[in-house]
Amino acid sequence: MLFRSDTELCFSYTPLDTSLIFNASLLAAESLALAHRLTGDGDLKILVEKSLRYVINRQKADGGWDYGTRWRHRWMDNFHTAYILLSIHRLKNYGLNVNLPIEKCLVHGIDFWIDNFFLDDGTPKYFPESVHPVDIHSAAAAIGAAMELSTFDKRGEKIGRNVLRWTIRNMMDEEGFFYYQISKKGKIKTPFMRWGQAWMAHALAAYLECDKGGA
């Protein structure tokens, strides 16, 4: 871990990394929460609670989060916001019984995400203030997160369905792969395996698992 106080902590990507990145720290917290569920180790629960508190306490007044704490990381995008919300949602469902305003944080965060990162037709924006570039990773993360979050906020199912429809119509090649980006100048059709194809496969699986209304 990189930052630690009596009440908070933040995990780093690696032992050598010095950046404080919110979604990365929460991924570590998810792993510890699962280990706590399996072992009942109370020390793990304390670590999870402190790391969750760190992120909740840094939620901005509008409901969003910067990517990280350094000045060069003080921007927001669609998929990192989705990652943060999803981790908080999963940690809530672990039933850790921690004294934190998790539901209030989720409500505020989901409101911000829905209001700032999607157009009415399902286009996934990259930044709150800019649609372009429309990125396949933004689309995939949004679909998966929205469908999973729909158990907490029913709007998630509609968001996930709308983004999926838009993505298939606008970013799926007739050969079956998904394009990398749509910029203001046009489509970048490179089929990146991890960034695009793997994440869209995950998104499609999440959609099929959660969908109740049909595409």
Please tell me what each predicted stretch does:
Residues 1-215:
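Glycan-recognition and catalytic cores of secretory/periplasmic carbohydrate-active enzymes
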